[in-house]
């Protein structure tokens, strides 16, 4: 951006003095002049494009003097409006500040450029109808929107500009009305929600009052029927019954432990376990019936609230009894399983001992039979020896033994001594068994 004096450009309008301060309504715009940005300050709502051109030319002449290259009058130049590839020459009387504000959010994409009229268009746009127009040989539908706008007459271009301003104003109005409608909808929604919340709070207060009345009525009825201390009695009775049940359970546990220590109460434990199981089933069925009855009675009047409280206390006591009986049953079941394991172990030991006893009995019987056979054979051999000695003959058995003995003594291997030892041990065992 080339340096130049802002104060100089601020005072280049026709109806303003150089020493007058800038009003708070004054604005500024950027105009491209010879590929440089020039800031034009002091714009008002009455400033036109020809005023901006005059200020730019005066500033250029004051800056460069005789070396200036923007020659000619202000009417020989025009300001071109460029936006996203399209461009349009502004008429001299265009309110430049109004046009700049109308672009709104598209201001960063829009530029003002100072060009010479003859270089931009063959014929200026603001001349009268007496000026001879050059015919364009190109077809209108083959031209770009910017070039097509250049071919239009000035009055039609003015109408298009006015129409564009009206459309922009309408768009702004529509957006503002849409925002207002959204805000109104939100306000109505908040008000309706606040109203519903107040109604719900009021209804809750009414229900609380009705509940308090019903409770007071039930309290008076209970005082008339059961006395003034019915609450203490209702809470003290279950405690005494619970203590008695605890004592009963402790005595039953001690008894079951004694029975287990004796080892003779397995059948009794099974019976007790069956009894507790039946009791558990019975209590569970009663609890289910009570729960169903409580569910059906929930839709009745508030007069049965006291009965429901008693039933709830009974249900709680029954649940406590059920839990205690379940614990006792689990203890008994654990003791019973331990006893069964011990019985199985003792049975296995007895079976092993019985098998050992049978094996020992078989061995003993076999040894006894062999000892009897040995004794009988010995007696028979004695009788035969006596008979042979009386006849003077040597029995063949002794002869064989003698021969084997002589043969063994002649051997050098030493096996005879081993055979003799084995024979002696076997004979000694036989004699011992015989005795």
UniProtKB/Swiss-Prot annotation:
Name of the protein this chain belongs to: Ras association domain-containing protein 9
Source species of the chain: Rattus norvegicus
Domain Ras-associating residues, every copy: 25-119
Compositional bias annotation for Basic and acidic residues: 375-386
Subcellular location: Endosome
Classification via Gene3D superfamilies: Phosphatidylinositol 3-kinase Catalytic Subunit, Chain A, domain 1 (3.10.20.90)
Cross-referenced InterPro entries: N-RASSF, RA_dom, RASSF9_RA, Ubiquitin-like_domsf
Record's keyword terms, sorted: Coiled coil, Endosome
């Amino acid at each position: 951006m080339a340096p130049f004096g802002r104060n100089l450009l601020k005072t280049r309008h026709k109806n303003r003095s150089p020493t007058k301060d800038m009003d708070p309504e004054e604005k500024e715009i950027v105009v491209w002049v010879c590929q440089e940005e020039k800031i034009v300050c002091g714009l008002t709502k009455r400033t036109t494009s020809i005023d901006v051109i005059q200020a730019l030319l005066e500033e250029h002449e004051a800056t460069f003097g005789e070396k200036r290259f923007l020659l000619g009058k202000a009417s020989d130049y025009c300001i071109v409006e460029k936006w996203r590839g399209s461009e349009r020459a502004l008429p001299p009387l265009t309110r430049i500040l109004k046009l700049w504000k109308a672009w709104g959010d598209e201001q960063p994409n829009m530029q003002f450029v100072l060009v010479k009229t003859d270089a931009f268009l063959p014929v200026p746009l603001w001349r009268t109808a007496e000026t001879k127009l050059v015919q364009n040989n190109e077809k209108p539908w083959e031209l770009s929107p910017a070039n097509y706008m250049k071919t239009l007459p000035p009055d039609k271009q003015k109408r298009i500009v006015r129409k564009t301003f009206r459309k922009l104003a309408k768009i702004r109005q529509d957006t503002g009305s849409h925002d207002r409608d959204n805000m109104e909808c939100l306000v109505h929604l908040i008000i309706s929600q606040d109203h519903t919340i107040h109604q719900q709070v009021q209804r809750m207060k009414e229900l609380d009052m009705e509940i308090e009345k019903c409770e007071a009525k039930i309290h008076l009825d209970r005082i008339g029927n059961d006395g003034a201390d019915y609450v203490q009695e209702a809470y003290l009775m279950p405690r005494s019954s619970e203590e008695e049940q605890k004592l009963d359970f402790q005595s039953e546990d001690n008894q079951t432990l004694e029975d287990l220590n004796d080892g003779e109460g397995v059948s009794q434990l099974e019976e007790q376990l069956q009894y507790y199981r039946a009791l558990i089933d019975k209590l569970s069925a009663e609890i289910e019936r009570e729960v169903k009855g409580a569910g059906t009675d929930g839709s009745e009047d508030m007069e049965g609230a006291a009965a429901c409280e008693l039933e709830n206390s009974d249900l709680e006591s029954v649940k406590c009894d059920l839990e205690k009986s379940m614990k006792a049953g689990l203890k008994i079941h654990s003791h019973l399983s331990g006893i069964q394991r011990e019985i199985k172990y003792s049975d296995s030991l007895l079976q092993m001992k019985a098998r050992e006893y049978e094996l020992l009995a078989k061995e003993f019987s076999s040894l006894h039979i062999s000892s009897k056979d040995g004794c009988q054979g010995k007696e028979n051999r004695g009788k035969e020896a006596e008979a042979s000695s009386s006849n003077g003959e040597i029995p063949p058995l002794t002869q064989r033994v003698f021969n084997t003995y002589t043969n063994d003594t002649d051997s050098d291997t030493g096996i005879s001594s081993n055979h003799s030892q084995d024979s002696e041990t076997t004979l000694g065992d036989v004699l011992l068994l015989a005795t």
